[in-house]
């Protein structure tokens, strides 16, 4: 610490210049669908507390890290931070994975920030530095299960910056602690809270990509796959009556809108081709009453017929 303070004091009088020897940051973290689902499920189960786990995968080359699987750690957390990693549990779990033919290595760790974004606290930076002591390319992934929605996952990957290599004064205003020298992927736009907590000085962000293989596609297709006996599950008559009543109310409203559209067409004279185009443009963004009526009536008939047929099949099979 004293050496760092002395070096900073000695560099105060130097002129600010750009440093062009920054390392490349085009490194990409590829997260599989299975690992992403397990991380989100684990993070949601711990709300409002933080949870953590380890990521398994391999370092493909100098610019690619593959995360194939994750497993949870039995760490108790608070709403701000989590405890350190349990080495005994980690060793036992890795030994059990090797017995079943899983030879992946630990490429980093993940933890959740429920509701307050993706960034690293001082405790998280210390935990990440302990992982980097074992492997210099270890990655810390932060996921926010509350702000994540369908089709958009709030997730980011980080790695710490060595404070001995960071010289603050000699850097010009245009210089950065880390420089991106590749157009592969994209970095997420940093939030204000992440910048306040040291993004760019204590740690930096990495590109994150999500990949899906053929086996993972089959797995995801089987998650909500229906079987033949699911069609025999019959809803109660009260539920069917309630749904039909709601559909009849919507049909009455659509009939009024449809009659209004018909009256407007009758009142207007026959327009030329240009006038028809303008009328079609005016209808954009409005409810197509005719199409909605066809959809609701067809679904109403299908539900009624399926309910009657299901009741007949169930009654016949029980006799």
From Swiss-Prot:
The keyword Metal-binding applies. PROSITE patterns: MPN. SUPFAM superfamilies: JAB1/MPN domain. Gene3D superfamilies: Cytidine Deaminase, domain 2 (3.40.140.10). GO terms for biological process: proteasome-mediated ubiquitin-dependent protein catabolic process. This is Uncharacterized protein F37A4.5. GO terms for molecular function: metal ion binding; metal-dependent deubiquitinase activity; proteasome binding. Keywords: Hydrolase, Metal-binding, Metalloprotease, Protease, Zinc. Zn(2+) binds at residues 111, 113, 124. Residues 29-164 form the MPN domain. Belongs to the peptidase M67A family. A motif (JAMM motif) lies at residues 111-124. One of its GO terms (cellular component) is nucleus.
């Amino acid at each position: 610490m004293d050496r760092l303070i002395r070096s900073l004091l000695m560099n105060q009088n130097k002129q600010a210049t750009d440093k062009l020897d920054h390392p490349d940051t085009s490194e990409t973290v590829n997260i599989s669908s299975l690992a992403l689902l397990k991380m989100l499920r684990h993070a949601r189960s711990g709300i409002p507390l933080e949870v953590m786990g380890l990521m398994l995968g391999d370092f493909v080359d100098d610019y690619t890290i593959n995360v194939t699987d994750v497993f949870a750690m039995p760490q108790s957390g608070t709403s701000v931070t989590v405890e350190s990693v349990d080495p005994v549990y980690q060793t036992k779990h890795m030994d059990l994975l090797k017995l079943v033919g899983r030879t992946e290595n630990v490429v980093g760790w993940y933890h959740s920030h429920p509701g307050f974004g993706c960034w690293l606290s001082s405790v998280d930076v210390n935990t990440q530095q302990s992982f980097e002591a074992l492997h210099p390319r270890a990655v810390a992934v932060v996921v926010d299960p509350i702000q994540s929605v369908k089709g958009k996952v709030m997730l980011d990957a980080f790695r710490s910056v060595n404070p001995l290599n960071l010289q603050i004064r000699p850097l010009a205003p245009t210089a950065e602690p880390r420089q991106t020298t590749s157009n592969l992927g994209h970095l997420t736009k940093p939030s204000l809270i992440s910048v306040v907590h040291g993004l760019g000085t204590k740690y930096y962000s990495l590109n994150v990509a999500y990949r899906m293989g053929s086996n993972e596609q089959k797995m995801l297709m089987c998650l909500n796959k229906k079987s033949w006996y699911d069609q025999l599950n019959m809803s109660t008559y009260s539920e069917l009556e309630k749904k039909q009543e709601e559909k009849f109310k919507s049909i009455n409203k659509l009939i009024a809108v449809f009659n209004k559209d018909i009256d407007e067409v009758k009142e207007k004279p026959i327009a030329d081709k240009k006038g028809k185009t303008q009328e079609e443009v005016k209808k954009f963004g409005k409810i197509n009453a005719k199409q909605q009526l066809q959809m609701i009536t067809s679904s109403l008939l299908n539900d009624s017929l399926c309910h009657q047929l299901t009741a007949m099949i169930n009654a016949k099979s029980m006799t």
